[in-house]
Amino acid sequence: MTEPLISGTVYPIQMLDKKGNNMTKQALVPVANGSEEMEAVTIIDVLRRAGVAVTVASVSDSKDLKITASRGTYIVADCSIHDCAGKAWDLIALPGGVPGSQHLAESTVLDQLLQTHVKELRLLGAICAAPAVILGEKGLLADKTATCHPQFYQSMKAKEVDTESRVVVDGNCVTSQGPGTAIDFALELVEQLCGVVKREEVASPMVLTTSPTAYY
């Protein structure tokens, strides 16, 4: 039986300035065994629709880049998180899932990347368990209003926990609640990274609706 594989290896055409410098936005999406697949794949897909160069990195110490997501879906990363060490990213976006979020939190390489990323005021996104288990526990939400999966409302260490909003933007930090808000979250990342026009351009062919009655 063939294993179902989701691999992210198609990159957008590079955008170069007049001096030949690469202007394509660069995003890092770390994944681990137990990451939430709907969130991970939605983030990757929507960002790539916007022309963002997305690198999917496994935090596993294994040389095998295949991870098993929270519902048994196999995802093949582009590289190991060790290959990303010391690089600057326009965006780091963290999918949730349990125990995936905990595995991401335990990665020393990812921790170093996150600490530098936050100090440089670069765009940071986290959804579901990730805001609480990763960002909150590392003290990266101490001055932020944020949201997360309802299961973690009481334990999330943030300046303020927003339990009403599907997506919360506070400065350079974007957080969201879970699988059902993943598209909203990913589109907000597109808007923050590439502008509202690009968000609308990406959203239009996705046949999105905000009205439940539209389905009946």
Describe the function of each predicted region.
Residues 24-36, 46-59, 78-79, 84-216:
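Active-site-adjacent pocket-lining segments in enzyme domains
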